[in-house]
Curated annotation (Swiss-Prot):
One of its GO terms (biological process) is L-tryptophan biosynthetic process. The keyword Thylakoid does not apply. Its EC number is 5.3.1.24. Keywords: Amino-acid biosynthesis, Aromatic amino acid biosynthesis, Isomerase, Tryptophan biosynthesis. Pathway: Amino-acid biosynthesis; L-tryptophan biosynthesis; L-tryptophan from chorismate: step 3/5. PANTHER family: N-(5'-PHOSPHORIBOSYL)ANTHRANILATE ISOMERASE. It holds the Pfam family PRAI. This is N-(5'-phosphoribosyl)anthranilate isomerase. SUPFAM superfamilies: Ribulose-phoshate binding barrel (SSF51366). It comes from Streptococcus pneumoniae serotype 19F (strain G54). It catalyses: N-(5-phospho-beta-D-ribosyl)anthranilate = 1-(2-carboxyphenylamino)-1-deoxy-D-ribulose 5-phosphate. Belongs to the TrpF family. GO terms for molecular function: phosphoribosylanthranilate isomerase activity. It comes from the Bacteria.
Length: 199
């Protein structure tokens, strides 16, 4: 079954909602953005997450020192890196790694040392999907996440189109820039059961 990552969480209530609804991954954004949290804030929230739900830290062009500090302070299970990636960034990290790839029309998939790839829209966090026809995932060495403009209305189609390891959502479960607990529940319900979640 396709796994679900709920990203950009910053409150106790949102974390608890995502966990209880069945999220497999919880994402904390450490890069500058409206969803950014500090290492200290994430460490507090991480204590609410059971061991079978994986904690992901999201970074843009980080140094290896930054990654190691966050892994240690927050207890991250994975790091997700956007932007520039040094050749040795993922070598011998104490946790798994995800390299984000912006799908911009050239169809290029990098030769990455990361454990997973994540395919995102050209502007991450914009709520806009990329053109799914521009991405060919045939023969990929790594399992991959699909992100970029996913929501409860299109996520089932995305899963049918790509058969990804996991799907990733942030703005698609927000209302007025804040995490919407009902949207989180409905999104996960659609992925896990292919239905709207309304009873």
């Amino acid at each position: 079954m396709t796994k679900v990552k709920i990203c950009g969480l910053s409150t106790k209530e949102a974390v608890e909602t995502a966990v209880s609804a069945g999220a497999d991954y919880i994402g904390f954004v450490f890069a500058p953005s409206k969803r950014q949290v500090t290492l200290e804030e994430a460490a507090v929230l991480a204590k609410l997450i059971p061991a079978d739900v994986k904690k992901v830290g999201v970074f843009v062009s980080p140094s290896r020192v930054e990654l190691l500090e966050a892994i240690d302070k927050v207890g991250l299970d994975l790091v997700q890196v956007h932007g520039q990636v040094a050749d040795d960034l993922f070598e011998n990290l104490p946790c798994a790694s995800i390299q984000a790839v912006q799908v911009d029309g050239n169809g290029h998939v990098p030769n990455s040392q990361a454990d997973y790839l994540l395919f995102d829209a050209p502007v991450a966090g914009s709520g806009q999907p990329f053109d799914w026809g521009q991405l060919d995932t045939t023969g990929l060495a790594q399992p991959f996440f699909i992100a970029g403009g996913l929501n409860e209305d299109n996520v089932v189609k995305a899963i049918q189109h790509f058969t990804p390891y996991a799907v990733d959502v942030s703005s698609g479960v927000e209302t007025d820039g804040q995490k919407d607990h009902e949207k989180i529940r409905r999104f996960i319900e659609r992925v896990k059961h292919g239905i709207s979640g309304t009873k």
